[in-house]
UniProtKB/Swiss-Prot annotation:
One of its GO terms (molecular function) is DNA binding. Its cofactor is Zn(2+). It comes from Desulfosudis oleivorans (strain DSM 6200 / JCM 39069 / Hxd3) (Desulfococcus oleovorans). This is Transcriptional repressor NrdR. The gene is nrdR. A zinc finger (unnamed) spans 3-34. Binds 1 zinc ion. PANTHER family: TRANSCRIPTIONAL REPRESSOR NRDR.
């Protein structure tokens, strides 16, 4: 690793630690030329996940997009942002573990609906109304009716 101060390639690692989420290694290094210390971070380079939309378009998987949809559905509900953030991290990990570079958007939508269904029925119906493209009040009624049957 090149020293950011003098440009020397001679240095030694004096400390290594994993990040809180175990996705990065933080290394403290000391330059053997100028004796100054610096920090480097090492992480696995991930290939971007591509989402295949209903119309065949492909987009990069964006956690912010999932977060935005869930936050809209959960607005004014008693659902902690931490629960949403944890779910999004789990979702991304699940998608990575599938081993596919292209994933149908339907898989993500169904996983989000399943999670919201477990958390809060109102948030679930809100999300489902957008995801399933409810056209009128009858679509809401059908979804609510099936929810009530399950209770």
């Amino acid at each position: 690793m090149k020293c950011p101060y003098c440009g020397s390639l001679d240095n030694k690692v004096i400390d290594s630690r994993l990040s809180r989420d175990d996705t990065e290694t933080r290394r403290r290094r000391e330059c053997l030329e100028c004796a100054r210390r610096f920090t480097t971070y090492e992480h696995v380079e991930k290939a971007p996940l591509m989402i295949v939309k209903k119309d065949g378009r492909r987009e990069e998987f964006l956690k912010d997009k999932v977060r935005s949809g869930m936050m809209s559905a959960c607005q004014k509900r008693r659902i902690s942002i931490n629960i949403i953030e944890d779910f999004i991290s789990e979702l991304e990990q699940d998608l990575m573990e599938m081993g596919e570079h292209e994933i149908p958007s339907s898989i993500i939508g169904e996983k989000v609906m399943k999670k919201l269904h477990a958390l809060d029925d109102v948030a679930y119906v809100r999300f489902a109304s957008v995801y399933r493209e409810f056209k009128d009040v009858h679509d809401f009624y059908s979804e609510l009716k099936s929810l009530l049957k399950k209770q």
